[in-house]
Regions:
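Conserved AAA+ ATPase core "coupling" helix
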Residues: 148-171
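Acidic/aromatic-lined carbohydrate-recognition and catalytic surfaces
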Residues: 2-149
């Protein structure tokens, strides 16, 4: 077996003007840097959506990806967001730290806006994704909708899944 080496760098630690590293241009630059340095591996931390405490080792789902890592500049290039919309939020003033509170407050509304502007092709891809991931996605979506509606502290064990779905439909 040939010896090789690599680097551990969380995606969140990549440079970004939007508060957190993404799978955008900086990720590609980092991969090119690794290749030029003779490194063969980029080890990353888990990519799930983080919960209270923002630890990648305590995600809401082991299947879902963290929406924070979606490249906003790619959404601008696709015409789903404007440069002004992406520049408007306060992403924090310390490039050495991720302010998860600011990220949560600003990024998710931008992603929702981008999806609302999506054309039929992207919507068809989202529908296909939902169908392909039907084993876990409906329950994850239900949980996240309940969390958004009622906050982080919920007594979900008091209700059946069907009762919870009815609560969301009424909200």
């Amino acid at each position: 077996m040939k010896r090789s080496s690599g680097v551990l760098l969380p995606v969140s630690a990549l440079p970004s003007p939007h508060g957190i590293g993404t799978f955008g241009a900086e990720a590609y630059r980092f991969i090119d840097f690794l290749a030029a340095a003779g490194q063969r591996y980029w080890q990353i931390l888990p990519l799930g959506p983080t919960s209270v405490g923002d630890s990648p080792y305590q995600p809401f789902s082991s299947h879902a990806g963290n929406p924070y890592f979606i490249d906003l500049e790619a959404l601008v290039r696709a015409g789903l967001l404007t440069t002004e919309e992406v520049a408007a939020p306060d992403w924090g003033n310390d490039p050495q730290r991720v302010d998860y509170g600011k990220i949560y407050a600003a990024r998710l509304p931008l992603l929702r806006r981008a999806f609302a502007r999506a054309g039929t092709q992207l919507r068809a891809e989202a529908t296909a994704f939902a169908e392909e991931n039907a084993a876990w996605l409906p329950d994850y979506a239900l949980y996240m909708a309940l969390r958004d509606r009622f906050g982080a502290i919920m007594r979900l064990e008091l209700y059946s899944v069907e009762e919870l779905r009815q609560v969301i439909q009424r909200s």
